[in-house]
Design a protein with these regions (language model features):
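Asparagine-centered strand-capping/turn motif at beta-strand->loop junctions
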Residues: 69-73
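Short, solvent-exposed loop/linker segments at beta-strand-coil boundaries, enriched for Pro/Gly
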Residues: 85-103
Length: 491
């Protein structure tokens, strides 16, 4: 019993000694941290002296920006106040070390320590056709009398909000900016016209469904843009607009026909345009001088459709840039190129004569004056399904005067074709002006050394007399693809 009490006494004594040492250390540390300076020579350091918000939609709150206020000095500093120069009328919202508002006071930044500032903004409508700049200053007033400032700036644009809109009568959208939440639908029997120069911003998971007819007529100088609504950056070098999956995509349903898209740019969605199986004899869609690029799924999927695609770019998809499942399709002067690197991907072009195991006769698939390229050794795949019960399901295709990344084959359906030979070092990148997989920047104008130059036939000149940029094509020896080669002039 006595022995146990002695052990308990010794243990308690050790605990008391340890507590005394820790208390002394804490008191010493607190005493050192509590030494504040009122000298104007001691300054704060900001991780950024200007906080810039990318172009924002008015009345819609911005993402939150964060910056750090550091005290690298040997003594602590007191901040008498932090305030927005615009006061309570400022559109900017500030949170400083847990305090929220346009005016905050009695803040401390200990020596060798830091605090965080969170900033956001919600801009009022400005009734301007161009982005309107808004600026304010966040003032830090130190106990010493020293003033330091961080600039806050943003640019706001007005948009027309469309939330779950269903177009039931013939409608023309005037040129402008539209922000789509949930969906934009066109009912059967109705036609939606979209004026040149229009931009449709789609929120996350928002989509467009056409049961009637879509008539989107842009121009070279005023294209129609379909894109996501994120205008900020993931990283300093990477806008969200270059990242696939920002919105859902466009569905042309089975009841829809006579759709026309000219000079449209559709990008960075889960899929581009999906044309569902419809009435066999209907002209389902004409795509001309347009760009579909950067998708999680397929850029263009055609199921038992009569479709014509002219002078267009279809690029960079985790699925296929073009997937054709039966029907009658013609591609003239198109660039179909896949350099998608976000995940393991499929080939640029795939042809099928079945849909979910059922026959889907491929009556005709013509690719004339086209480029089919990418980083794989073979970017063209055909799936000619053999059906039971002696079902003869058509699988007809033809490639003419085109530049194709596929092995040289003894096939009479390949006429005047030049075969690409991607090397192991550059993987087909040298065919185009810019293929930058580091910052996900792509320019599919053909390079001077690209073997697609002079490959095209003049037979289709009346179909595509100008390239997608509006440059006239020569009557003979034009280039394959949607871009005719133009020498870059050095300034």
């Amino acid at each position: 019993m006595v022995h146990s009490l002695n052990k308990l006494y010794i243990a308690m004594k050790r605990i008391y000694l340890l507590f005394t040492i820790i208390s002394a250390i804490l008191v010493t540390s607190c005493s050192e941290e509590a030494v504040f300076s009122s000298s104007p020579d001691y300054r704060l350091e900001f991780s950024s002296d200007t906080i810039s918000f990318d172009t924002l939609f008015t009345t819609v709150g911005s993402p939150t920006a964060t910056f750090v206020v550091r005290n690298r000095n040997s003594k602590s500093l007191r901040i008498s106040s932090v305030q927005l120069s615009g006061g309570e009328k400022s559109p900017f919202n500030i949170l400083v070390d847990g305090q929220y508002g346009s005016y905050m006071h009695d803040l401390e930044v200990r020596s060798k320590d830091s605090i965080y500032v969170l900033a956001s903004v919600c801009l009022e409508r400005n009734s301007s056709d161009s982005p309107v700049a808004v600026r304010d200053t966040l003032m830090f007033n130190l106990e010493s009398g020293l003033q330091q400032a961080v600039i806050l700036e943003a640019h706001g644009i007005d948009v027309v909000f469309m939330r779950g809109v269903n177009i039931e009568n013939d409608t023309i959208l005037p040129a402008g900016r539209y922000l789509v939440y949930d969906s934009l639908a066109v009912s059967s029997g109705a036609t939606l016209g979209i004026s040149s120069g229009t931009t449709l911003y789609f929120h996350d998971k928002a989509f467009m469904r056409v049961d009637g007819t879509l008539n989107a007529q842009g121009t070279v100088d005023s294209p129609i843009l379909f894109r996501g609504d994120r205008t900020d950056n993931m990283f300093s070098y990477l806008p969200y607009d270059r990242i696939p999956g920002q919105w859902d995509g466009i569905v042309i349903s089975s009841s829809s026909s006579n759709n026309v898209l000219r000079h449209c740019d559709i990008h960075s969605a889960n899929y581009g345009i999906r044309v569902d199986k419809g009435v066999a004899d209907d002209e389902r869609i004409l795509i001309e001088s347009s760009k579909l690029h950067n998708f999680h799924g397929n850029a263009l999927e055609l199921s038992m459709a009569r479709a014509v695609v002219v002078n267009s770019l279809l690029a960079n998809s985790q699925g296929n840039c073009v997937k054709v499942c039966g029907g009658d399709v013609r591609f003239i002067h198109c660039t179909i190129a896949n350099f998608y690197v976000w995940k393991v991907r499929d080939v640029a072009l795939s042809l099928h004569n079945s849909i979910e195991g059922e026959p889907a006769p491929l009556e005709n698939a013509l690719f004339a004056n086209c480029i089919i390229a990418g980083s794989k050794d073979d970017e063209v795949m055909g799936y000619n399904t053999a059906f039971a019960d002696s079902v003869d399901c058509a699988f007809n295709y033809r490639f003419e005067n085109s530049f194709i990344n596929t092995p040289d084959v003894a096939d009479t359906n390949f006429v005047n074709v030049v075969y690409d030979r991607p090397d192991s070092d550059f993987f087909g990148k040298l065919n185009f002006r810019t293929i930058d997989n580091e910052i996900f920047l792509y320019d599919f104008h053909i390079a001077a050394e690209c073997a697609a130059r002079g490959v095209a036939s003049g037979y289709y000149l009346d179909v595509a007399p100008f390239d997608v940029d509006g440059n006239p094509r020569p009557a003979t020896a034009a280039d394959a693809g949607c871009y005719n080669f133009v020498e870059i002039k050095e300034e």
